[in-house]
Amino acid sequence: VVYEIHEEKHYVVGRVRIAGNTITRDRVNRRDVALLPGQPLRLEELETTRQRLLEDANVASAQVRTVQGDGPNVADIEVSIEERRHIGTLEVGGGADAGAGEVGYIRVHQPNLDLFRWPRSATDWEGAFQGGGQELELELIPGTKESEYRARFVEPYFFRSDFSFSITGGTAYYDRRTYSEDHIKGAAAIQKFFDRGHRLSLALGYIADAVRVHDLDDDAPADAFDVEGRTFLAYPRLELRLREASRDFFSGPRGFSGLLRLDAAGDVTGSEVDFTRALATLDWSMGFFARIPELEHVLHVGAAFGWMEGRGEPVPLYERFYLGGPRTFPGFEYRRLGPHDGKTPVGGEGDVHGVVDYSFPFLRPEVRPFAIFEWGDLEPALSQISTERFRTAVGGGLQLRFKIAGQLIPANLYWVKALASEPEDREELFSFTLGINF
């Protein structure tokens, strides 16, 4: 048998042209183009480019094709897009969380802002303040026990570089049963992505937080009396992220994500409290038994490792790690796994915990039963973490995902039984989250 192979020409990318973007600047769409002039042409990257464009909120449809370039082995890339005319969103809703109380929710989001695109005349308002790829987000979350109000702005091309710049500010109020806690907080960060898919990034930020602890009851913990009044915290944050994952509204994420975070506060950073804190998280999810993401069975494994230590004095209780409740450790009441002073949780400086869960669609993708196993320990110091004190919990529940009048309504119901606990813990068989942003 003789095989004859006729090898096609090897092409390189020539020019990349973008058409159809009457509102959005070219550089905003070019960040999604996986092909660069001068590099070898790979056909799979044409589809990658199209998929990335379709993930942008400002793109309604996209086509990517090759045409003959200036040389015999040169292929130009033509990108044709159709823009959405209105992409800003206003969300209004509410929800509840076992232990954290009920909340209202108002969110305004504009993912394609341009602060420097001012109207050129009194009638030029259709494209004003649009097309720059900047992001503005406002969130108002008033609640019965916890309230948060924040604003966030992101410039993805800081001074036309590959760095993004973000600034965040807001206030928060928390009712901790035996005392109250207020925050006025601001943060700024510069982030560098190391690949065009925005999978690996390194961010350097600075956080300032004015904290007030007040309205202490007689039985409030001693740690709360130690920090009563106003305290100013200021510290840099270094954060390394890896995210090789996609997400489906009904069935959740697929792939791998990891986070390494380091905070260091002290006199030199402008903080009234000295401490060092590190956090590492890992999450991996895989789908099975279906080609359509929303119909897949999903196995998820996650783990978190936290350490902090004060320099000369304990870390304030409002900066410590807490576990318990449906968001962090179902089977235990909200924040009530781990160290307590009387009836009030005071958190810990050493945290190790993880989860394994398995979910699948039941008749419809909106309804997903799941089984869950939780494990972990929270102690006053990392050196006190012990497998003999590991808490474990097992159970199941329902993930419900609905769209009502265009509004996404997620709800999670947990029936989880603690298998191993300590005397200071507060167990909880049923817990739930309901509403937006849970």
Positions of predicted regions on the chain:
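Periplasmic polypeptide-binding modules associated with outer-membrane biogenesis and secretion
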Residues: V1-D97, Q110, W118-E155, E181-I184, ...
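Solvent-exposed, non-transmembrane alpha-helical starts
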Residues: Y11-R15, D162, R199-S201, F249-F250
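C-terminal outer-membrane beta-barrel translocator/porin domains of Gram-negative envelope proteins
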Residues: E55, D70, I77, H86-G101, ...
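Outer-membrane beta-barrel channels and translocator barrels
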Residues: V59, G99-G101, L113-L115, G131-G133, ...
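One face of beta-strands
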Residues: A62, I77, L90-V92, E102-I106, ...
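Outer-membrane beta-barrel proteins
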Residues: L140-G143, A172-H183, A265-D274, L419-E422
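Transmembrane beta-barrel wall of Gram-negative outer-membrane proteins
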Residues: P142-R230
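C-terminal structured "cap/appendage" subdomains that terminate the fold
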Residues: L378, I385-A405, I409-A411, W415
